[in-house]
Amino acid sequence: MAHTAQNIMPKPGKKYRLITRSDMDGLVCAVLLKELDIIENVTFAHPKDMQDGLIEVGPDDITTNLPYVEGAYLAFDHHASEVTRAKNKHANHVILPDAPSAARVVYDYFGGAATFPNLTAGIMEAVDKADAAQFTKDDILSPKGWELLSFIMDGRTGLGRFKDFNISNYQLMMKLIEHCRDHDTIEDILKLPDVKERTDLYFEHHIKAKAQIERCAKIEEKLVVLDFRKEETIWAANRFIVYALFPQANMSLHILWGKNKQNTIFAIGKSILNRTAKIDVGALCLSYGGGGHNAAGTCQFENIKSEDKLHEIIGKINKNA
């Protein structure tokens, strides 16, 4: 089911603020809306901040790839869960659950190729691939081009934990919007000093991360369990490496310390290479007081209960794998 708002267009001469996520999808949404000359500034937000009302949203705002918040002028999304969560159809909520990215929803809404004839080559295909996680094993283990850019822009890769870069992620995003609008090739973009600084660190960590994952992994039937509790440092890596290293697994479970080792966190996900897992991860985590969506979720436990809960959850996953 899709909600569309085909009659709502930006007011002539009006400039809006874009509120989006700081990732590849957010970047391309910003490029598209800048091409239309309808945004003057960008705010990057986390989905939970939107749900918790921490971001003030009003009639001068356009949101993309974020939970729907009433009050925005237009809201674009492609998450099926939002159709359920938003419940009532809102005239300003453009949601196409079958679209691979929110950028694709924006692109199609404003007229596609006819409206955007000058986009950087390959950018729409790249954002669709990244946001739908349609990566190959080779993309994951030897990333280059747009795939590499998407991994260094993903906060979950974790590069920011290890270095104060020359410019912040926000400044980099703003720079990349302009470089993509100037129709630079992806090769040119990867040569930018502020991008190269991040890709160099990515590859430096990549080797250590692969060795760490292989060392910490234990296979439980179709599930790979990664226990990082004895690791002093968890190296930065794209979040799909575990699936490329263990192609026989269709799910992963990461065991991590909570804040100050006061509790234990389980982060559970489905493989993007072996897409045979049937269990609803979000529902499983919710049953333990956590949450998530169909393909990924987290829950946390008191340290003393974590081993019992781990065996229980492994059993449930393998029963439904």
Regions found by a protein language model. Name each.
Residues 130-222:
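Hydrophobic, aromatic-enriched interface-forming segments
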